[in-house]
Amino acid sequence: MSVGILGTKLGMTQVFDEAGRAIPVTVVQAGPCPVTQIKTAQTDGYTAIQIGYGSTTEKALTRPELGHLKKSGSTPVRHLQEYRLADVSEYELGQSISADLFSEGQLVDISGTSIGRGFAGYQKRHNFRRGPMGHGSKNHRAPGSTGAGTTPGRIYPGKRMAGQMGNVKKTIRKLTVVRVDAERNVLLIKGSVPGKPGALLNIQPATIVGES
């Protein structure tokens, strides 16, 4: 795994390329993220770094969390994220990781929490076809058959049904970094990313790179 960065989704806009084509982009506030812990094989059994993101008050954190951050000299942060690495020698406590970690044209994977839609029905949640809309129809948005009868006498686990939609972790892979504003720690990512404006995002270099 390679080092990534935490950020906040600010919203969407569009930019134009050299040919005048409009490109929809998501504006992401990426970092800065201080290194709050360095794990080694001798002390932890594996090598990794931990970074923090998002300022908060001391009152919002527990004493163990405050003590943990004090070791790195970091100010109180709201979020922590760990990245496993083969070599951590180039990192040190308190080091800041910012948007210049990425470059224009680079492919990235972005993880976040999708927008919660509440309790949703079959059509909205699973794209089921609706029933006939004629006057005599008694099945407009009902699911249809959910299984057999006496045998097995139950609905199998995993059956697609109405229920909570969204508000789950989603990862969108191989998105392109269109622009990098290192001064303001802002990334412009081609396309959409999970969540609504203000959502926390985890941005990492793409792990699967290829045409297919």
Swiss-Prot record:
Mention any one GO cellular component term assigned to this protein in its UniProt record: cytosolic large ribosomal subunit
Recorded hits in InterPro entries, A to Z, give: Ribosomal_uL3, Ribosomal_uL3_bac/org-type, Ribosomal_uL3_CS, Transl_B-barrel_sf
Q: What ranges does the record give for the region Disordered, renumbered to this chain?
A: 129-156
Q: Name the PROSITE patterns on file.
A: RIBOSOMAL_L3
UniProt keyword RNA-binding, yes or no:
yes
Bias regions of kind Low complexity — which residues?
142-153
Superkingdom of the source species: Bacteria
Disulphide bridges: none
Q: Which GO terms describe its biological process?
A: translation
What the protein does comes down to: One of the primary rRNA binding proteins, it binds directly near the 3'-end of the 23S rRNA, where it nucleates assembly of the 50S subunit.
Q: What is this protein called?
A: Large ribosomal subunit protein uL3
Q: Which species is the source of this protein?
A: Acaryochloris marina (strain MBIC 11017)
Lineage runs: Bacteria, Bacillati, Cyanobacteriota, Cyanophyceae, Acaryochloridales
Report the gene name.
rplC
